[in-house]
Regions:
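Coiled-coil dimerization/phosphotransfer module
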Residues: 1-131
Length: 131
């Protein structure tokens, strides 16, 4: 799913979209796979629409019973606290939906961004679960 999505973004938007996943995605539990796909999709959409990113990278690793995912872009960046406040006021829930999806799976979600420095999202999710 992620590889096809990356190819689609490269073709449609001319962005360099790098995906590094150490094993076949279809071996992951369906709930985990689906939620991670939606989070990556939202992050990529935000990077293109708001950040004017030219490069997006998604790196996934497994170890110690958990999956770690890092999504980075070279876009314009933003003040995270300010955007979260404005998003709540405008009832725009992209960032909060990403975070909720990860917390639903007992994971952790962090976002780091500053104007002029791109955006980095880090996710950790336990690997247990039903497929």
């Amino acid at each position: 799913m992620l590889f096809r999505s990356a190819e689609s973004y490269e073709d449609r938007y001319g962005v360099d979209f790098e995906v590094a996943v150490p094993t076949a995605e279809d071996t992951l539990p369906i709930v985990l796979r689906s939620n991670l796909f939606r989070v990556v999709q939202e992050a990529a959409s935000n990077a293109l629409r708001h950040g004017n990113a030219k490069k997006i990278s998604v790196h996934c690793s497994y170890g110690d019973g958990e999956l770690s995912l890092k999504i980075e872009d070279d876009g314009v960046g933003f003040d995270v606290d300010k955007v979260k406040t404005k998003s709540a006021e405008r009832r725009s829930f992209g960032l909060s939906n990403m975070e909720e999806r990860i917390r639903f799976m007992n994971g952790t979600f962090s976002i780091d961004s500053q104007p002029g420095q791109g955006t980095r999202i880090r996710i950790t999710v336990p690997m247990e679960g039903d497929s």
